[in-house]
Amino acid sequence: LKAMKAMFMVLVLSLIGGYIFSLLHIPIPWMLGPIIVVMLAQFIYKGPLNWSGKLRDLGVVIVGTSIGVRFNIDLFTMLGSILFHMLLLNIILIAGSIGIAYLTSKWTKVPMKASVLGAIPGGLGQIVVFAEEEKVEEIGVISYFQVIRLLLVVVLVPFIVAGHAVGKQIVDAKFSLSLILLIALAWVCSYLMKRIHFPVSYFITPILLLITLQLFTPLTMPHVPGFVMAIAQLLIGAHIGLMLKPHMVKLPIRILIGGVASALALIILTFGSSFIMSFSMGASFATSFLSTAPGGLDQMVLLADAVHADISLVSTFQTFRLLFIFLLVMPLMKLFYRWREKKECIREQEANVENVNV
């Protein structure tokens, strides 16, 4: 009962936040409103606040379903040129992240390993699990760096791209039983993929499922109506709002400032690299920036949807970034640290041998 009350409290706060933000015509109001209101409430309200991870997953499945229905299959014919751009932009991003981490580590006196894990724009959950596996002590600092990046991206980026919205006549879809069945099917498939440790399963599975259904079945897919997308925004926003815990703000001031500075530097870096994409691929500014921005996959796609950017391109680029980090960058980091530990071990043994000889 207590847990239900804590969740109900977050739901009420999220609804208030979403409603206020939509009255103020702020971009993606039903995600930004809950994030800001729930986050601030943690510092004022002393009772328990809680949100189910399953509800957040449902929000992500809805976003994935919405993309899958509208995914531009023609993208596959352009994969060659897109792949080159995705690799180039991700190499710039990772090199930039490591550079930013180096400067942050020098200034905040946080060890380089923790600083890199704080700066790399992967998924927060996966980065923290990786840090625990690697026995990094500064888990709190890494979590703070990752959360502050997510929050700054989700709060600043909408205002950067809002002026670049493309005016499109929106035909709002009808809510139907077939849509409920489709979301349920996507959720079940995502859950099964999660069981076999498929990366970002709740997001990628619905997209793959719907692309497959569109390619191989004569079914017409129901579009996701605006109010269902607003529900998805709220389910995700409430979860993000609870991520910045009051105890995180008790970190040393240098680390607090370092986290904000490193997140802003990443946003500036991706803002710059988005012009490469815009120039060489002829994509709009909103599409390019949302494709490269170091935010959460689901949030960037919701934003792309709000400003009518090319969601197929944004979701492809953002998914590639996460997979690039999970499947290539992290294993390479593991190998690098193993090699360094071995080297240090050998050095220590040699030093010991010398001491014995002396």
Language model segments and positions:
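Core mid-bundle transmembrane helix pairs that form the ion/substrate translocation pathway
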Residues: L11, L15-S22, G163-L219
